[in-house]
């Protein structure tokens, strides 16, 4: 099995994002700050070389990192 490019926390954040949770809701659910949620999202976008959340989601699905 291939090693995930996402940390467990990044994966949790994106799994909630694709379920239409807001940044605030994700922060509350994972018991972390809004800023930390945004940092996780930014880190993933940097890893993937994409400019937006939607593009990150598409790439993660292509890479089998996320299932919808």
Question: Model-found features: residue ranges?
Answer:
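Helix-turn-helix DNA-binding segment
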Residues: 1-34
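Hydrophobic residues on short alpha-helical segments
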Residues: 11-15, 45, 57
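Residues within the DNA-recognition helix of helix-turn-helix
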Residues: 40-43
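Basic, Lys/Arg-enriched C-terminal extension of HTH/homeodomain DNA-binding domains
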Residues: 46-68
């Amino acid at each position: 099995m291939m090693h995930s490019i996402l940390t467990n926390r990044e994966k949790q954040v994106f799994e909630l994002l694709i379920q239409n949770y807001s940044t605030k809701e994700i922060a509350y659910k994972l018991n972390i700050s809004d800023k930390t949620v945004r940092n996780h999202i930014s880190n993933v976008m940097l890893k993937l070389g994409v400019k937006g959340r939607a593009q990150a989601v598409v790439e993660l699905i292509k890479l089998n990192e996320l299932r919808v």
